[in-house]
């Protein structure tokens, strides 16, 4: 057996204690061991089943899987994505990486600032709206940033359109006036079918509205400027980012342009600085002192010792309502793998299903299952100390009290002679407490999740930076639409029923 397989066996043999016993045994020591403050964010793992024995086992696993070496490769611009023979340099966009990559990112950010200056100076006419067209990582990040941080900004109206369903574009067209709209097409390859179809429809919308030089209203955010120029966008209106920045890690690059335009450059710079602070922590902290690695330890306990197939994230803050959807792609597209780095079948469970919602709404929808269902679901709560409104304090006090009470109730449960009213308890939760939802704190929070994903990938021995699993369905959709592939009778019958002959 290898050292890694020994560690996995030790985890299988490890016996978890009841949460209430763990917390009651030595509360001060537990808080010291499982609560961290990084970048003005409090990460509280005290209500998880982690104990000293589990942490020691998983620390041995991290060493066996060369966590230190893979982390160094990540930050030095080495081949962190071996299946595509690429680096993974999203941290360089925040100033932490190979010097040449950091300099390239700084040059890109300067071009972004110049583009914003040009828009504000009227180079594209009187622009009031930005229609951002992308999908996946080219849309989820910008949408999250603008929705979370743009509540008090009146700079520009931004609509992020990702779905190829024409209703999505129709909705944006209804809100915007063509003569005052700029269109950003975001695609790493500039070959994404849905994005280009939406871009062509937006071009037609501008043309039919009588906009002079409609293609001149387009800018491109891409790692393939040649394809963007072939589509018709002038080189001066292309903001190119590096191929070594993965789509779901790209909001720090020109993909984040909608946020920089809508919020202002200072806010975008604060976002980068918050992420950079988390980068420094992840790069320098070792073992369980590293909050991203500690979080991965908890993830592996639940996925590969206690058999949890899902993980729920609930943001008790309306501004973070899009965060669960963002994390779904980040976590499941990164670590939803079944093959290790050396091509062997993965013996452990990979990423669980990530899902969630916003509190307190979710309490009236899904918490029944969390408290009394037969599935054990680790829950993550995210809440801020400071509200973003001027309403009565009772609003925020009630919100925070509900968030904290849910974690306590999941852990403690409640006995009852009436089984229908009994709560089994011993259900784990993590609480992430922000001082406030700001560009800096959101940058740090997103970077925490990125590095947590990477730490989990190291423990599992998988590559978190490829996504070959998304290709087959797209290829088959193309063949089905074009009629160039023979499909099974059931699929042919369904296609005929949906679209006719």
Swiss-Prot record:
Pathway note: Carbohydrate biosynthesis; gluconeogenesis; Carbohydrate degradation; glycolysis; D-glyceraldehyde 3-phosphate and glycerone phosphate from D-glucose: step 2/4
Region of interest: Disordered: 78-101
Source organism superkingdom: Bacteria
Listed EC numbers: 5.3.1.9
Main localization, broad class: cytoplasm
Cross-referenced Pfam families: PGI
Basic and acidic residues bias (residue ranges): 86-97
GO terms (BP aspect): gluconeogenesis; glucose 6-phosphate metabolic process; glycolytic process
Uppermost EC category: isomerase
Positions annotated as active site in the UniProt record: 333 (proton donor), 364, 474
Alphabetically ordered keywords of this record: Cytoplasm, Gluconeogenesis, Glycolysis, Isomerase
InterPro entries referenced in this protein's UniProt entry, alphabetically: G6P_Isomerase (IPR001672), G6P_Isomerase_C (IPR023096), Phosphoglucose_isomerase_CS (IPR018189), SIS_dom_sf (IPR046348), SIS_PGI_1 (IPR035476), SIS_PGI_2 (IPR035482)
Any single Gene Ontology cellular-component annotation: cytosol
Catalytic reactions of this protein: alpha-D-glucose 6-phosphate = beta-D-fructose 6-phosphate
Single GO term (MF): glucose-6-phosphate isomerase activity
Family matches, as PANTHER family: GLUCOSE-6-PHOSPHATE ISOMERASE
Role played: Catalyzes the reversible isomerization of glucose-6-phosphate to fructose-6-phosphate.
Similarity comment: Belongs to the GPI family.
Designated name of the protein: Glucose-6-phosphate isomerase
